[in-house]
From Swiss-Prot:
InterPro entries: Ribosomal_bL20 (IPR005813), RIBOSOMAL_L20_CS (IPR049946), Ribosomal_protein_bL20_C (IPR035566). The keyword RNA-binding applies. This is Large ribosomal subunit protein bL20. Keywords: Ribonucleoprotein, Ribosomal protein, RNA-binding, rRNA-binding. The lineage of its organism: Bacteria, Bacillati, Bacillota, Bacilli, Lactobacillales. It holds the Pfam family Ribosomal_L20. GO terms for biological process: ribosomal large subunit assembly; translation.
Length: 117
């Protein structure tokens, strides 16, 4: 009777290698390691999507803070930019807000001018 020792050992080694660095028994025992590796794959999949949401939230927070320093709310700024037909994404706006205040102020002034009309 063959028990597939080579195949089983290879499978277990692969899982334990993936579990390297995990805390406690999760990197030593096959069953707990396998469970943790499965969870890790789930967390990685979930958080790749979460990261996009988190960055968008961060950009909006930064844009809002800079917009308020220029006398506008976030929504007013975005609406004004849309009316002015200035297409700049939130990532770039947030970068300008942090690294180039003068350029952000120019965009905010353009948005204000369109909102005033």
């Amino acid at each position: 009777m063959l028990e597939g020792g080579v195949v089983s050992r290879k499978r277990r080694k692969r899982i334990l290698k993936l579990a390297k660095g995990y805390y406690g028994a999760k990197h030593l025992l096959f069953r707990t390691a396998k469970e943790q590796v499965m969870n890790s794959y789930y967390y990685a999949y979930r958080d790749r999507r979460q990261k996009k949401r988190d960055f968008r939230k961060l950009w909006i927070t930064r844009i809002n803070a800079a917009a308020r320093m220029n006398g506008l709310s976030y929504s007013q700024l975005m609406h004004g930019l849309k009316l002015a037909e200035i297409e700049v994404n939130r990532k770039m706006l947030a970068d300008l807000a942090v690294n180039d205040a003068a350029a952000f102020t120019a965009l905010a002034d353009a948005a204000k001018a369109k909102l005033a009309k």
